[in-house]
A protein has these predicted regions:
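Periplasmic-binding protein-like
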Residues: 73, 132-141, 199-203, 233-236, ...
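Flexible loop/hinge segments that line or gate small-molecule binding clefts
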Residues: 139-182, 279-295
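Short beta-strand elements in bilobed, periplasmic/extracellular small-molecule ligand-binding domains
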Residues: 101-115, 198-201, 212-242
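Flexible loop/turn connectors
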Residues: 6, 19, 249-353
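N-terminal helix-turn-helix DNA-binding module of bacterial transcription factors
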Residues: 1-61, 353
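An alpha-beta-alpha
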Residues: 186-225, 319-341
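Amphipathic helical "hinge" segments at domain boundaries
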Residues: 47-125, 134, 219
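Hydrophobic alpha-helical segments within soluble ligand-binding/sensing domains
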Residues: 173-200, 242-248, 296-318
């Protein structure tokens, strides 16, 4: 018996094959009523897509020569355009997202926190629809780690993903670095270099947004040393901008031999320390950090993976909130640097701060 083809289904539905193809992928460029009618007809007639054909077509659509396929929206919830340009993490995430989107034939429309369109958020779903947006990426979660309530009307209909930080709610797809393993491996690297008293310096708000993954891994990575947990915890200092005096007081009391941090400001502060200078490593290392060692979180790959999540679900016609959200995590790589040698590092006035 001859299998039902897309051409047969198109003839029965009274539309073209391209319309059927888009409707079966639940593409928002086709009216919802038409999509539902064609999907119901396909089910009634027993139509099944040929998986090999779908694979080949997917490869063709994702080739480097792909023409314009649609648009993605990148929404900076707490991120202004200027902050996105200044912050090395956001810059890398955006670069990875935009480069991958371009390679797949997608345009990226940006909506920043200081954009009037974003501030008038009740109108944003209509704007996205008018622009033919097919997928949405969110960047910069609020401190409580949840998406704002006004995004519900967007994520209930669009393919959506969060960049960089997994939201506590709602359950939508996320692309991020594996922050727990990043911190854990960084401590192990310091141990391998003979450091016995590493300390952790970071913003408590950031660690809370990451549900404690940096600090939890810092503690867990040292339990095998036999040192009591409460003594290890004393070597965590919650960073406060400009609080150099409290930092130096804590540093003198705890006497760490190495510091893991997300704050470059620590280096010039340490020049006023009256004890031995520690080795330094950054938990979110970037090539712009002259002389620093640390963990390269591969944020460009995180950004690219977010595009792959969006495009793969679009290809399967999966829109709205997923039944089971995917979290794609990228591992970090250790990068050596002069900051592991305090005498050399602090004698060089060109180090990043």
């Amino acid at each position: 018996m001859k299998s039902l083809s897309m051409a047969d289904l198109a003839q029965a539905a009274g539309v073209g094959k391209a319309t059927v193809s888009l409707a079966l992928r639940n593409d928002p460029r086709i009216r919802e009523s038409t999509r539902r009618r064609i999907q119901a007809l396909a089910k009634k007639m027993g139509y099944r897509a040929n998986p090999m054909v779908a694979l080949v077509m997917g490869q063709l659509r994702s080739s480097s020569n792909t023409k314009y396929r649609g648009s993605f929206a990148l929404i900076g919830l707490q991120i202004t355009k200027s902050l996105a340009e200044q912050n090395h993490t956001f810059r890398s995430l955006l670069r990875g997202f935009e480069n991958r989107a371009t390679a797949l034939g997608y345009q990226v429309d940006h909506f920043w926190a200081d954009d009037p369109l974003l501030q008038a958020n009740p109108k944003l779903p209509d704007v996205l629809q008018a622009r033919g947006i097919q997928g949405v990426a969110f960047l910069g979660l609020p401190s409580k780690g949840t998406l704002p309530s006004w995004t519900e009307s967007i994520i209930s209909h669009q393919v959506s993903v969060v960049l960089g930080t997994r939201p506590s709610s709602p359950a939508i797809h996320c692309s991020s670095n594996d922050q727990y393993t990043t911190s854990f491996d960084a401590v192990r690297q310091l141990h391998a270099l003979g450091k016995k008293r590493p300390a952790l310096i970071l913003s408590q708000a950031i660690d809370s947004l990451l549900t404690g993954r940096f600090s939890a891994a810092f503690l867990q990575s040292q339990t095998s040393t036999g040192e009591p947990l409460h003594k290890i915890a004393e070597r965590i200092w919650w960073f406060q901008p400009g609080d150099q005096s409290s930092f130096l007081e804590w540093f003198a009391q705890t006497k760490p031999d190495s510091l893991l941090t997300t704050h470059l400001e620590i280096a010039p502060w340490l020049k006023n320390a009256k004890t031995s200078l520690p080795a330094l490593a950054h938990l979110d290392w970037d090539p712009s950090m002259t002389g620093w060692a640390g963990m390269n979180q591969n944020n460009e790959t995180v950004g690219a993976n977010a595009v792959d999540l969006l495009s793969s679900h679009l290809m399967r016609g999966e829109h709205g909130l997923p039944l089971s959200a995917k979290v794609l995590q990228v591992e970090s790589q250790w990068v050596d640097g002069a900051s592991l040698n305090p005498k050399l590092f602090f004698s060089n006035k060109s180090f990043s701060a």
